[in-house]
Amino acid sequence: MEITLTDIEKEAYKDSPVHRLDSRVKLLATILIIIFAVSLPRVHEDNLIRLAVVELYLVILMALASLNPAYIIVRFLAVLPFGLGIIVIQPFVRQPFFDSFTVYPLDLPFGLTITYEGLTFGITLLAKFIVCISAIILLSSATKMHDIVGAARQLGIPKEIALLLTMMVRYLFLFWSVLKRIRTAQKCRLFNIWNKKVHRKWILEQIGYTISSIFIMAYEQGERTYISMLCRGYGQNGNMKINKKDLKIPDILFSGTTVLVIVGSYILS
């Protein structure tokens, strides 16, 4: 299953109790969950219980949002290698914040040893990583990208950063569209990056040409976009239009429930 930017935006346009929540509330809840997960002790016997409670809460929210399970799994697996590379080496590393280590009696090659403390720390890192990624996937899947930027602007981020985020979101879709056209043209010419019958150097040259073409097209598009913005009155004092809404009862209930889950998971464990 292939997930594209368009698929992400389609999920965000669904109608569910989670989708109808105020974007500011969802953004703050995501930030709060990430801060909670990151701020937990490096190693503690109750860490996994606390994180499991929060993860269960996120899974329930995903179910209420009617998100496609296959879509969630594919997005999660796409990000997993970035954190897994750091997590896997932890059992073999002696972290400086431990005073002593308990070595497992395993005969490993290259003189490697696995410590109980390193393994515990690695498992804790994995649990934190899963919770943080789940929160981000839920936010991006249940909230339109423009609404996320608008919520961040209302919460006080500088307008310059909000403008950059807005432009980045637009250019992501433009970049994907350009890349698809280039890939379609290459396929029509029977170009296959994994073709073993073609010299690898030639394939790398074609990849370099593709990257160069995208860079030049992005530069030209940026110039055209900037000129269009100036023609529409863009300047130093320009502001981003934000549709301000008052918080409703579901938003308040969601905020309270999120805080209760986080505080409860910490106190009861």
What are these regions (language model features)?
Residues 75-197:
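Juxtamembrane/interface alpha-helical elements of multi-pass membrane proteins
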Residues 1-43, 52-57, 177-269:
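Transmembrane alpha-helix interface motif
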Residues 25, 49-50, 158-162:
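Membrane-interface starts of transmembrane alpha-helices
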Residues 69-81, 251-255:
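Alpha-helical transmembrane segments and their helix-start/interface "positive-inside/aromatic belt" motifs
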Residues 53-60, 146-151:
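Hydrophobic transmembrane alpha-helix segments characteristic of membrane transport
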Residues 56-64, 80-85:
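Alpha-helical transmembrane segments and their membrane-interface exit regions
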Residues 36-47, 64-71:
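Short, hydrophobic transmembrane alpha-helix segments
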